[in-house]
Amino acid sequence: MKGSFVAKSSVTIRAEATKVWDALTNPELIKQYLFGTQAISDWKEGSSITYKGVWQGKAYEDKGVIKKIEPKKRLVTTYWSVFSGLPDSPENYHTVTYTLEQRDSETILTVTQDNITSKESADHSESNWTTVLETLKQLLEREHST
């Protein structure tokens, strides 16, 4: 598979980049905004990352590798999902890039996911990312206001 479509979603969060970064790399927080998913990694470049959970009654274990870490700025991972229906092989992995941009007391978080094979799949991924980012925003802004 070599997809030419990209999904992109962005959100502005009333929180410092430090807090947003923590939410991207803290398994307890990830579970709260990523559909109850358990994220397992040591968060070092070159390390694996595993996402485990149950979706619509079916257990899953998705995975990838951490390619780049720039704390409070950028996180780049590869990602493969069992739900893709594609074999677990390098050409079927997406690259997911999280970019943080601090502006005063707010952080703009942008997520891009590449190597998507169709516009329909890209639209679906973009919709999922929008939901995830809005949930993350609510979580962090609720923490910020308390």
Model features per residue range: what roles?
Residues 20-21, 30, 49-51, 66, ...:
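Hydrophobic pocket/interface hotspot
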Residues 25-26, 71, 141:
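Residues at helix-coil transition
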